[in-house]
Amino acid sequence: MTLFAVLGAMTFAAKYAMAFLPNIEPVSLFVMLFAVTFGKKAVYPIYLYVAMELLFFGIGTWNIMYLYIWGVLALAAYGCRSMESSLGWAILSGGFGLLFGAFCAPVDLAVGGVGYAVSKWISGIPFDLAHCAGNFVIALVLFKPMRRLTERLYSR
């Protein structure tokens, strides 16, 4: 459990350290790593990270999105856990970043209706593109070495 607590806190700290870059974050990489390394136990570091976001930044509609959006990525990554290609992981992570606004749309629809959800999604496209590019590059460069490190830490 200590490892999961440290990894959840590390995810929060790493995102916060990169906050000056719009929609470029390491959280997607960590969620994928946790899913492929820990399986079902990935919920511990993932939702510790979500709890820290809620405690640090307060409550908003994005909290609802975070309750399911990281689980979607974790399930996708777990389904691809046997994939060896760095490019494949980069495509998965980049695709998730590109679709992030779409994944948020159901909550926006419930909160503000169709007009609000559509306008928010469209206005967020430049940020989704940045999210896509950032996720792609981060996963392409770091997924394989970080996977080896995470697996080594978990085996101890």
Predicted regions and their residues:
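Central hydrophobic cores of alpha-helical transmembrane segments
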Residues: V43-L55, G88-L98
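Structural signal for the C-terminal ends of transmembrane alpha-helices
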Residues: V36-G39, A76-E84, K144-E151
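Hydrophobic transmembrane alpha-helices
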Residues: M1-L33, T37, K41-P45
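Membrane-helix interface segments
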Residues: M1, K40-P45, S82-G88, A117
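Residues within alpha-helical transmembrane segments of multi-pass membrane proteins, especially transporters
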Residues: M10-A13, A17, F30-L33, T37, ...
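Interfacial aromatic-anchored transmembrane helix boundaries in multi-pass membrane proteins
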Residues: F12-E25, L48-M83, G112
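Membrane-embedded alpha-helical hairpins and interfacial helices in multi-pass inner-membrane proteins
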Residues: N63-L67, S85-R156
